[in-house]
Amino acid sequence: TVPYNTGTRHETCTALSTQAQQYYTDGAETLLKLSGSTSDSSLESMDSALYRALQSLMTDTMTDSVTYKSLPTYWARTDASQGKDGLLLFYSDTTGGRMSREHVWPKSRASFMQQNGGSDLHHLRPEDSGVNSTRSNYTMGNVLGVYPDCTTKAFDGKTVLWYSSKNDRVEVADNVKGDLARVLLYVYCRWGQPNLFEKVSTDNLPPYDSDDRENTGMPVIESLDTLLEWMQEDPVDTWEMSRNDCVQQVQGNRNVFIDYPEFAWLLFGRELPADYDTPSGYSHEHGSDVENFTLTAASSDETRGTVTVRSHTVTAFPAEGYCVGGYTLTPADAAVVKQNGNVFT
């Protein structure tokens, strides 16, 4: 019998569960020492020793699977709210609604439909059908402060989605962003879907499952920076850890990015943040202290447009019709700035 999820939402998890500790039979330290990629490409990063090892671990230990139809039966326990108090919806982060099966990684951007990755408990989550429909298959990314004409979707009296259809972007609530990022990383690694944060050509996409006929190869999240930012802003909570335990009892495998979120940074050759609370505490012990600095932005001609700052991203409005002149840093080595059109990161 699958136990009920007894964790607490938004209670930061600072210790590995007993199941998590036992899962890494040779010790996670061996994995943590493997080389990740030196590329910012999600496709090229699949060739690294760390990626291959994590994929093998999550594949080899997945000794069982469930059907697409049976998912709600398992969710009643794996996604229980506070023990047995209803089913927790994914984006809405509350109970109630008209439940539907949500592919967090959109079907149209994957090689699966309702088999394999399309019926994996670590991937598919319950969501209100109206919210699910609004989410559509848009690329996840920052919308607030980036697209001023964005639309919102509310559920149970609170906004749960911000989206811009014409820009193919949707943003979830801050307290769901980490959960979502860790699901995407799992699908990327376990099911070998290369278009995590870049568009991938048909030649480099995995073959379709027997019930699938479409994979656009479009990215599921806008950038690696956004992925890691969301991971850090919304750390693993005890509910996620408990859910990982519950799903392991069904499928045999775990989402390693819940136990060790640090793998996300190591996969892509990024330095671990030292101020990041994780279940293992590895980031605190091995992360780099990042020097704090203040980010300000101003338009040189506010009659033509404005700029906004959100987290580490500066965006100029309108996106078209005028030229972004450049940037200056004080001190000069305070940060590395990348420019992509009207967006600085």
Language-model features, listed with the residues they occupy:
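N-terminal module-boundary/linker segments of secreted carbohydrate-active enzymes
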Residues: 1-93, 266-286
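Generic detection of short hydrophobic beta-strand segments and adjacent strand-loop junctions
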Residues: 2, 11, 309, 344-345
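Domain-level detector of nuclease and nuclease-like folds
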Residues: 94-100, 104-287
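Short, solvent-exposed loop/edge segments of extracellular or virion-exposed proteins
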Residues: 291-310, 334
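Surface-exposed interfaces of beta-sheet-rich extracellular modules
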Residues: 313-345
